[in-house]
From Swiss-Prot:
Subcellular localization(s) per the UniProt record: Membrane
UniProt entry tagged with the keyword Transmembrane: yes
Keyword Signal: no
Residue numbers spanned by region Disordered: 55-75, 318-347
Residues making up the signal peptide according to the UniProt record: none
Domain of life, source organism: Eukaryota
Chain ranges passing through the membrane: 243-263
Organism for this UniProt entry: Dictyostelium discoideum
Protein name, as recorded: AAC-rich mRNA clone AAC4 protein
Gene that encodes the chain: AAC4
Keyword tags: Membrane, Repeat, Transmembrane, Transmembrane helix
């Protein structure tokens, strides 16, 4: 395995370092200590180690020079004093093993010098003693990113969990101590040496998922019989350790895929195969090409077979049987006899058109793809050469032309819609009644004025509703409360496109000024968009906010964005509720109560409520008929200042003719402390 040399990679690792006891004392200013208290000392960092090494340079010049001569190929300058630094590292017998800082599920093995080392692997695990194994000891120079390995004896493995267990370990008081540090290495070159020979395993590149100790360590089991004196054996073994996990995953994926494929094949074989049945189908060839007898043959009606221009006819035996059956049916029923004779004549005419003058037809042989020309009079069969290759493009066009001819026949009965068709006219924007008087006159002429049928859905949309508990919906700047079944009735009415309903809720603002309302994107869009005139902008904004926050409506078009036929009634905005296009008209009842003086200016009578409902419901019907982008239903949103007014509106709503109520949902909000709405 090799990596590119033109990139600089950084890796965060846990580095265990073995220090002599003298160095450890000097770094921590300790004169003496006991084994039990050794783990309570602070962690020794690499920077502290380098500082101690630099302080000891003057005392170790001779040893440093000797060690530099033995390690010419492995030393790299460390701030101008790498020789002294490297020699001191070897003098204190530091042992550094790096592992990548990434999530690992398996246990990593680290090593320290000594015969037996006792260490706690995890807080919940027991301490264990591991026997001595051979291992390649690694020395790391952190600042220069250089790694070298030496084969030594009497090295015991330490078992540590990756990332989570950074521990201090110790052997004997008078030898050396192993401490851990977290370092960031600029990894450029990683060399492994065995018996003064170097093998370049890694050379830069991406080190995201590489654990380097796997590539440079010896076997994790006993390897006394393995000859590590050979450089090639060491490199090949290291390379194998890095490749085996990859092939292991590939083999698992392939095995899984083979098992699934075998199971699907076995399941397919277990399915029962249907036996072939003869085809007794008569299909005319409108283009008057050959007709093929496929009786007692099994063929799938696929697109490829249509490209070959294969159609089906009954043979003589089946024709005789069908004629006998038809004769029996004719004896039983004279009416059926005439119909069957007509169908038989039509079939004979089709057969005469398809077959030639000598009553010849051609039979297709599926085994060798040849055609047999058969003469009915002489009962002779003449083999013809294999069917010629046809032009697939022309055959495809002819095939679709046959269907076009069939469609033209079907549409002759009036199923083809043009612009004058009633269904097309109903979808086009129009104005049938220009005023309420015309609509009432139409109701009187058709005896619909007294038709006050509640609804075709008497169980869901009636004034006889069950008693239920109240509900309260609180938002940051307003709240709505009313019957707990109102939400259910609201959505149920929207789903029913044939009838209307009326629902009453109470609205209470939680702020004193309308500018303090927290608006949704749709509400802010209505507020910022100029309307068609009037001072009802806040009533429209809050109407949408209630529909959005309580019933899940999403704004589709504002008042000026909706298109109508010229001279029609208009709607304030349209919304989308559960993928249904709904129009919304907003009405305010403000002439009967003095909000500032808190007194009634006039009495809201049932007659006024009835006239108001007639006028507004007619406007809803007119705008629905004249709108270009058709909606499925419309909501008449009514704002009132008194609960008495809301009660009167509910009573008079059910007295309105059913054709005027149409499928409009009337939603009444009794608002208090909402002078800005009116």
């Amino acid at each position: 395995m090799s990596l590119s040399n033109n990139q600089t990679q950084f890796v965060t690792v846990f580095v265990p370092i073995q220090l002599s006891i003298d160095v450890f004392r000097k770094m921590n200013n300790i004169n003496s200590f006991v084994n039990d208290n050794l783990t309570n000392f602070p962690i020794v960092t690499v920077d502290q180690l380098i500082k101690v090494v630099n302080n000891n340079n003057n005392n170790n010049n001779n040893n440093n020079n000797n060690n530099n001569n033995n390690n010419n190929n492995t030393s790299i300058s460390n701030n101008g004093d790498i020789n002294n630094c490297l020699a001191t590292f070897e003098q204190v017998q530091n042992n550094c093993f790096e592992t990548c800082d990434f999530k690992a599920t398996e246990r990593e093995h680290y090593f320290a010098s000594g015969k037996q080392i006792q260490e706690s692997v995890l807080p919940e695990e027991e301490e264990e003693k591991i026997s001595v194994n051979n291992f390649a000891m690694v020395t790391v120079e952190p600042n220069n990113c250089f790694v070298k390995a030496q084969q030594i004896n009497s090295v015991a493995p330490l078992s540590l969990d990756n990332r989570n267990c950074v521990r201090r370990a110790h052997r004997e008081v008078n030898t050396f101590v192993q401490v851990f540090d977290v370092c960031v290495f600029n990894l450029k070159v990683v060399n492994v040496a065995t018996n003064e020979s170097q093998v370049n395993l890694f050379n830069g590149g991406n080190v995201e998922n590489i654990c380097f100790d796997r590539s440079i360590q010896m076997p994790r089991s006993s390897a006394d019989d393995f000859d590590w004196s050979s450089q090639q054996q060491s490199s090949w073994y290291s390379l194998a350790l890095s490749i085996i996990p990859i092939y292991h995953e590939i083999i698992l994926v392939l095995c899984n895929w083979l098992v699934v494929a075998f199971y699907k094949y076995w399941q397919h074989q277990q399915q029962k195969q249907l036996p072939p049945h003869p085809l007794n189908i008569i299909v005319p060839n409108v283009s008057k090409r050959i007709a093929v007898n496929l009786n007692n043959q099994l063929i799938s009606l696929t697109f490829t077979n249509f490209l070959k221009n294969i159609f089906f006819l009954n043979n003589n035996n089946n024709n005789n049987n069908n004629n006998n059956n038809n004769n029996n049916n004719n004896n039983n029923n004279n009416n059926n006899n005439n119909n069957n004779n007509k169908t038989n004549n039509n079939q004979l005419n089709l057969s005469k058109e398809i077959c030639n003058e000598n009553l010849n037809f051609e039979e297709f042989n599926f085994e060798d793809e040849s055609v047999c020309k058969y003469n009915r009079l002489t009962n002779s069969c003449e083999n013809i050469s294999k069917i010629q290759q046809v032009n697939e493009e022309s055959e495809l066009l002819d095939w679709f032309s046959d269907f076009e001819e069939m469609d033209s026949v079907l549409l002759q009965n009036g199923t083809e819609f043009d612009n004058d068709h009633p269904m097309v006219k109903s979808q086009a924007p129009s104005i049938t009644f220009k005023s309420l008087d015309q609509f009432i006159k139409y109701l009187e002429e058709n005896n619909c004025v007294d038709d006050i049928e509640v609804s075709p859905c008497s169980k869901s949309h009636t004034f006889n509703r069950p008693v239920s508990t109240p509900r309260l919906i609180i938002k940051p700047t307003w709240c709505v409360y009313g019957d707990s079944l109102n939400t259910e009735f609201f959505h149920s009415c929207l789903k029913d496109k044939t009838c209307g309903d009326i629902i009453v809720d109470h609205f209470e603002p939680l702020v004193s000024s309308p500018t303090d309302f927290l608006l949704s994107n749709g509400g802010q869009r209505i507020l910022d968009t100029p309307n068609a005139g009037g001072s009802s902008v806040w009533s429209e904004v809050l109407s949408f906010e209630v529909l959005n926050q309580v019933f899940g409506a999403q704004l589709k078009k504002t008042e000026t964005e909706i298109e109508y036929a010229p001279g029609s009634k208009i709607t304030d905005f349209s919304v989308d509720i559960n993928n249904s296009h709904i129009g919304v008209s907003v009405v305010r009842i403000i002439n009967f109560f003095d909000l500032n003086g808190r007194t009634y200016k006039a009495v809201f009578t049932p007659e006024y409520a009835r006239n108001l409902l007639y006028k507004k419901l007619f406007g809803v019907i007119a705008s629905t008929e004249a709108v270009v982008d058709k909606w499925e239903k419309q909501i008449l949103y009514v704002w009132t200042t008194s609960s008495c007014v809301a009660d009167i509106i509910v009573q008079e709503y059910w007295k309105v003719p059913a054709k005027l109520r149409s499928n409009t949902l009337v939603y009444v909000n009794h608002a208090t402390n909402s002078e800005f709405l009116f």
